[in-house]
Design a protein with these regions (language model features):
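Short, glycine-/small- and polar/acidic-enriched structural segments
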Residues: 1-125, 129-135, 139-145, 158-168
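Short linear loop/turn motifs
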Residues: 20, 27-28, 118-121, 229-235, ...
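Amphipathic, soluble alpha/beta structural segments
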Residues: 50, 54, 64, 70, ...
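Pocket-lining segment of extracytoplasmic ligand-binding domains
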Residues: 109, 127-219
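Secondary-structure end/capping motifs
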Residues: 182-265
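Conserved C-terminal helix/tail region of periplasmic/extracytoplasmic solute-binding proteins
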Residues: 253-293
Length: 293
């Protein structure tokens, strides 16, 4: 959402930038970034971890979501965690934040996939996961707050709010390569500033109507109650000082190791995944405070 707003409100232009916003599933986005086709991405720390352990130089410079802020939506008829036993749950890509959210969420519900005969299916991107749920290919899946309202509007109720568990987890952040940061420091700083201003615009109550209109347009929501829920969830998601959360990254590394997703994650420190230098500069110069004045 901060990127949509930064684009629509001309914030990028104020920094002499005109980025093309492209929706690509996170795993493919990272591949494109490694290839040099894309310079920036909003990706989870799990994808950065996979890139780093494979020898890449990707790093996270802003932290946009520092907890697992997902909702579990289910097909009609599923009323409790017990009803999920023997069912199929879509997890997106095997090593993404959505997969991690699913593991943690099922654990919070007292469920163990193998013991409870829950089949975890790699359903791909968010639109593909939605289609699988709507068509009956899966029985449940976790969705982020914006998309959850679309799923709810289609008649698939929310069973569990993982965000209320407050699990520290760097679910999303602004990612680029360390090489690009060194070669293009002004572009990196200006793009980060524009994204931060976009987030501050979303969080400012005076801009609520503009933000709600953007949500309605981009997510094709029309019911006022759904729009209000989506707005509230989005406005509350991004920290006022969106720096990478080292504790949240440590949680990512631990979960990836525990679930056998990437054993090499155990060899890394949070600082191997995040570059805090730009955030420190913006904090020291008072930028974070100024955008919220």
């Amino acid at each position: 959402m901060p990127l949509w707003i930064a684009k629509e409100q001309g914030i990028f232009r104020r920094y002499n930038l005109d980025p093309q916003l492209i929706y690509i599933i996170a795993g493919r986005a990272m591949q494109s970034m490694i290839a040099g086709d894309i310079q920036f991405g909003l990706l989870g720390a799990s994808h950065v971890t996979n890139a780093v352990t494979a020898g890449g130089d990707m790093t996270m410079l802003l932290g946009m979501e520092d907890k697992l802020n997902y909702f579990l939506n289910v097909r009609p008829g599923i009323k409790s965690a017990e009803d999920l036993k023997g069912k199929k749950v879509g997890i997106g890509t095997p090593s993404g934040s959505l997969a991690m959210a699913t593991y943690v969420g099922l654990d919070q519900l007292g469920l163990v996939p193998r013991r409870d005969r829950i089949t975890l299916l790699n359903t791909g991107s968010t639109p593909e996961r939605m289609s699988a749920l709507f068509a009956g290919g899966i029985d449940a899946a976790f969705f982020n707050p914006e998309v959850e309202q679309v799923v709810l509007q289609q008649g698939f109720p929310m069973l569990f709010d993982l965000g209320k568990a407050n699990v520290p987890y760097q679910a999303s952040g602004l990612v680029t390569s360390r090489k690009y940061m060194r070669s293009n420091p002004l572009i990196v700083e200006n793009l980060a500033k524009a994204v931060i201003e976009g987030a501050a615009f979303v969080q400012n109550p005076a801009n609520k109507k503009t933000v709600v209109d953007s949500i309605a347009r981009n997510l094709r929501l029309d019911r006022p109650d759904r729009l209000e829920s989506a707005y509230r969830a989005i406005a509350d998601t991004v920290p006022r000082k969106p720096c990478p959360n080292l504790a949240g990254i440590a949680s990512v590394l631990k979960l990836m190791t525990q679930h056998g997703i990437n054993p090499k994650a155990a060899e890394l420190k949070p600082e191997d995944i995040a570059d805090m230098s730009l955030c420190k500069k913006l904090d020291d110069t008072g930028f974070f405070n100024r955008v919220h004045q």
